[in-house]
């Protein structure tokens, strides 16, 4: 369907953007051919000259006979004639000036309209080019499509001398085949064709009949019955009607064979005439004949890149392709939640409605292109925490929060790179943190949690209760669950600072925790994973199977995924507590994981990253090869397109989520391999924040902020 739509659009664009261009060019060619078979064209000017002379004689009205009038009458006539000529010259001069002014004004308007149209076309071309440049495979598909379109129209563009060449005649004879069956069209994957029975015949459309109709009937049904070519200067040849009756009496294959022989016996000009009559019938813009709702439904099957190309076909197609609801659906497919409202550089013409959803889609596409191959500009460098380790990192909106074993947290601006404030109050190193809006929560080796106001830096609450280091926490709305080396978990109200529940059952330090508002899931050094009901403080399930410490957890409300020092990853059913899959393949500790829509990405101390489908338990990709990390993976994050990973080797790498292919290094520390480490990474749609440093003093502790945003004017 995509190629059929675009082939119509490509032909229309090459011929002037409308079918009227084809009709006008065909009409000119037909008139030229008429003049070949009509009478001598010089006779018409001679008749016009005689008529003009006769009219002049009648208008002058002068008697050529001498003595017919006296001198006074003759003088009066001359005076009147002179006065008439003078007035006529003045009026004609004014009229000419007025016509020149009007013509000049019209030319200016036309030039302005042409300039606006050129700007619109350039803008659409740029949007389409952005999509073309983003994917090599897309460019190959487009090249193949353009080749197909060119092949379909190459006969039309051939000069007459090529049409009459022996090579052309030979190849056309070889290529022409009798096709007695119906044409079978395939549809792209995921795109289901509309059933004809689902729609009634619309006004202006020709319903498909069960029996074949003649080409003349088709032209008449299309409203072009009066446009049929009539050569009136030549009488119908003798026996024409008998020949036509004989032709109609033949079978379908016999008619095709006869047409083949007829075409081979025609001269090039005659073949061209047939093409001019037939071709417009197959270039009809069926989209413009459909009701708008149905036309938009058809266009909704196009990919965004093809939709942008379709917008360049004509004005009506561009209006359809700018439909805001159409682009909203495209945005939903890509996970874009909000439209983009921007200031336009120029006023949109009446009839063209700017689509904020389209702008949002194009902006996101350009951002993805920046991540993939955009120029890596110098990052903002945020220096702080001296030479201490950055143990935790949060990034939300334009605010960055870093926690360190120097007992402090720092709040940074992701826009300016400035340190906005330092949160001081803990008496031990900060090892865990969470952030939402203007609230920051931190856990420390001093056995407390603190709730901070990110705007003012004020400590709102200090939460006491744990008897050892607060090693992990998870925030959900107004509650936070903390896990400690004292083997317990506590549920806190961050608004009041009260401890609501205490969950006891582990026999070793709690290393990781997840909370969805209903259930708490915890992993500990006792090899166990536990599922809790925090309201009743009861353990619903103890998930046994790991043979070493549990270091990482993910929980989506249905599945629990646990990573252990025993090198395995286990997928559990949270309702039954059963182990669904055991994912094997890593060779060491799984230090970090992230789960979205049944896709799990795991990073391991064996320097590899794996992508899994937790429903099937299948490993989809292993991110390795010559460009893989050379040391343990420290942190990772992924979205619908990319996987970002950091490592002890001092690099941050970008990978393709679908193919597993390495794209490029986003960060490479000069001290990488000799002590430089990327401890933590956090990424938004447009920014990447990296916490870097070293354990031997070779790399200064700092934050690096990379920006991949685009300017949508």
Curated annotation (Swiss-Prot):
Modified residues (Phosphothreonine): 211
Biased composition (Polar residues): 69-84
Annotated localization: Nucleus, Nucleoplasm; Chromosome
All copies of domain F-box, residue ranges: 284-330
One Pfam family from the record: WD40
WD repeat spans: 384-424, 426-462, 465-504, 506-542, 545-584, 586-624, 628-665
Pathway: Protein modification; protein ubiquitination
Top-level taxonomy: Eukaryota, Metazoa, Chordata, Craniata, Vertebrata
Compositional bias (Acidic residues): 87-135
Coiled-coil boundaries: 94-136
Gene Ontology molecular-function annotations: cyclin binding; identical protein binding; phosphothreonine residue binding; protein-macromolecule adaptor activity; ubiquitin binding; ubiquitin protein ligase binding; ubiquitin-like ligase-substrate adaptor activity; ubiquitin-protein transferase activator activity
Name listed for the protein in its UniProt record: F-box/WD repeat-containing protein 7
PANTHER family: F-BOX_WD REPEAT-CONTAINING PROTEIN 7, PHOSPHOLIPASE A-2-ACTIVATING PROTEIN
Posttranslational mods: Phosphorylation at Thr-211 promotes interaction with PIN1, leading to disrupt FBXW7 dimerization and promoting FBXW7 autoubiquitination and degradation. Phosphorylated by ATM at Ser-26 in response to DNA damage, promoting recruitment to DNA damage sites and 'Lys-63'-linked ubiquitination of phosphorylated XRCC4. Ubiquitinated: autoubiquitinates following phosphorylation at Thr-211 and subsequent interaction with PIN1. Ubiquitination leads to its degradation.
Keyword set, alphabetical order: Biological rhythms, Chromosome, Coiled coil, DNA damage, DNA repair, Nucleus, Phosphoprotein, Repeat, Ubl conjugation, Ubl conjugation pathway, WD repeat
Modified residues (Phosphoserine): 26, 233
Ranges for region Disordered: 1-150
One annotated Gene Ontology cellular component of this protein: perinuclear region of cytoplasm
Purpose: Substrate recognition component of a SCF (SKP1-CUL1-F-box protein) E3 ubiquitin-protein ligase complex which mediates the ubiquitination and subsequent proteasomal degradation of target proteins. Recognizes and binds phosphorylated sites/phosphodegrons within target proteins and thereafter brings them to the SCF complex for ubiquitination. Identified substrates include cyclin-E (CCNE1 or CCNE2), JUN, MYC, NOTCH1 released notch intracellular domain (NICD), NOTCH2, MCL1, MLST8, RICTOR and probably PSEN1.
Classification via SMART domains: FBOX (SM00256), WD40 (SM00320)
CDD domains the record matches: F-box_FBXW7, WD40
Gene that encodes the chain: Fbxw7
GO biological process assignments: DNA damage response; DNA repair; lung development; negative regulation of gene expression; negative regulation of osteoclast development; Notch signaling pathway; positive regulation of ERK1 and ERK2 cascade; positive regulation of oxidative stress-induced neuron intrinsic apoptotic signaling pathway
Start-end of Basic and acidic residues biased regions: 46-55, 136-145
Chief localisation class: nucleus
Signal sequence bounds: none
Lineage top rank: taxon: Eukaryota
